[in-house]
Every structure is written in structure tokens, then in C-alpha cells.
């Protein structure tokens, strides 16, 4: 039989002692000890007092302020009178009405734009001599109007349009073309 070499057993007593308890029953003590040690170290490093030096104050005294002298102007009711008046005005039988909200437009109605487009009025039936040419140049017919071009009948010729060079009667001297012609229509004086 070959000889087996025997290994010498190390005894657990020769191991260097650990700084914390090793038994499982003392786990609670281990955690609390380490926590308090760490906290104490951190507090000391930042300059705060350690947990061991902390003494809880027995009683904190709140300062007593004397009542304020009444500074109100003569003729002004006191707060007690105001609160009594408010209490008497509110009836306890009916609950206070909620604040009324402005009526919201329904979703079915089309939303009105905040900026209204300008409305153009057709020129009045004044003679053209009194109307300055700037008004006639800037007037545009409404979009939905079905007005026809400015046609008029003269006894000697057929239908004729109002042109700057042509002569036209006083009643038919407004330009309805869109956009307006560059030189304004001239009217006979």
C-alpha cells in the first residue's frame, strides 16, 4: 500500500481576528455597529457632531408675541365685524353657488376668427366727378357678388366698357374689374 501524505490541518485559532463578529447570531449587531461607525466617520469628516455626542433637546421654547395694536384708520370696520357680516350674508341652508364660467362655444358651431376680414361696400350712386380717383382705384367687389363688368348703352354705338380714354356717362363710371386697372378710370367733367 502506498503511503498517502497527510496534510497538516490549520487550526482556526491561528487566523488573525476579524474586526467584526463572525457568528451568524450576531448579524444584527454587525450591521448596526458598522452603520454607526460609518455614520460617525462621515459626520466627523464633514464637521457635523457625531451621533454619540448628539443630545436631544428636552423642550423648544416658542417665543410669545404680544398682540398687535390696532392700526386701522377710523371708520374701517374690524375683522370681527367683517367676518360676522360675511357669515350673516351666507345662508347655511343652500350651498354656495359655484363660480359661473363663461359659456364655451359648442364644437358643432364654426369658430369665429378673432380678426374679422374687412368688408367692402360698393360706392354710392354719386356722380364720378365728386369721387376722388383713389377711392375708385382701391375698391374691390365683394367675393360673393355676381356683378357683371361695367357695360352701358350709348345711342350711337353698341355696348361699351368703361375705359380710361373712352367717354362714359356719369352713372356707369365705376370700375368692377379685379384687380383694378393701373390708371384709374377717368370721368368726364
From Swiss-Prot:
Query: What are the entry keywords?
Result: Host cytoplasm, Host nucleus, Host-virus interaction, mRNA transport, Phosphoprotein, RNA-binding, Transport
Q: Where is this motif: Nuclear export signal?
A: 82-93
Q: What is the effect of changing residue 85 to A?
A: No effect on mRNA export
Modified residues annotated as Phosphoserine in this record? 70, 177
Drop me one GO molecular function for this one: RNA binding
Q: Which Gene Ontology terms of cellular component type are present?
A: host cell cytoplasm; host cell nucleolus
Quick one: where's region Homomultimerization? 56-70, 123-131
Question: Which residue intervals are annotated with compositional bias (Polar residues) in the record?
Answer: 143-164
- Compositionally biased tracts (Basic residues): 1-16
Q: According to the UniProt record, where is the region Disordered? A: 1-27, 73-189
Q: Might you name a Gene Ontology BP term for this protein?
A: mRNA transport
List other remarks. Answer: HTLV-1 lineages are divided in four clades, A (Cosmopolitan), B (Central African group), C (Melanesian group) and D (New Central African group).
Summary of the function given for this chain in its UniProt record: Rex escorts unspliced gag-pro-pol and singly spliced env mRNAs out of the nucleus of infected cells. These mRNAs carry a recognition sequence called Rex responsive element (RxRE or XRE) located at the 3' region of the long terminal repeat (LTR). This function is essential since most HTLV proteins are translated from unspliced or partially spliced pre-mRNAs that cannot exit the nucleus by the pathway used by fully processed cellular mRNAs. Rex itself is translated from a fully spliced mRNA that probably readily exits the nucleus.
Recorded protein name is: Protein Rex
Amino acid at each position: 500500500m502506498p503511503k498517502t501524505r497527510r496534510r497538516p490541518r490549520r487550526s482556526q485559532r491561528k487566523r488573525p481576528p476579524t474586526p467584526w463578529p463572525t457568528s451568524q447570531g450576531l448579524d444584527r449587531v454587525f450591521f448596526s455597529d458598522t452603520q454607526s461607525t460609518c455614520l460617525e466617520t462621515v459626520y466627523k469628516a464633514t464637521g457635523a457632531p457625531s451621533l454619540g455626542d448628539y443630545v436631544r433637546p428636552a423642550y423648544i421654547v416658542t417665543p410669545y408675541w404680544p398682540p398687535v395694536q390696532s392700526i386701522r384708520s377710523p371708520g374701517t370696520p374690524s375683522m370681527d365685524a367683517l367676518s360676522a357680516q360675511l357669515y350673516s350674508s351666507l345662508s347655511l341652508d343652500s350651498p354656495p353657488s359655484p363660480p359661473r364660467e363663461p359659456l364655451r362655444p359648442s364644437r358643432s358651431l364654426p369658430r369665429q376668427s378673432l380678426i374679422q376680414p374687412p368688408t367692402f361696400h360698393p360706392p354710392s350712386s354719386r356722380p364720378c366727378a365728386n369721387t376722388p380717383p383713389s377711392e375708385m382705384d382701391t375698391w374691390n367687389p365683394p367675393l360673393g357678388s355676381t356683378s357683371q363688368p361695367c357695360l352701358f348703352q350709348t345711342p350711337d354705338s353698341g355696348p361699351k366698357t368703361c375705359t380710361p380714354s373712352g367717354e362714359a356717362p356719369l352713372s356707369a363710371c365705376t370700375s368692377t374689374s379685379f384687380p383694378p386697372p393701373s390708371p384709374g378710370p377717368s370721368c368726364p367733367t
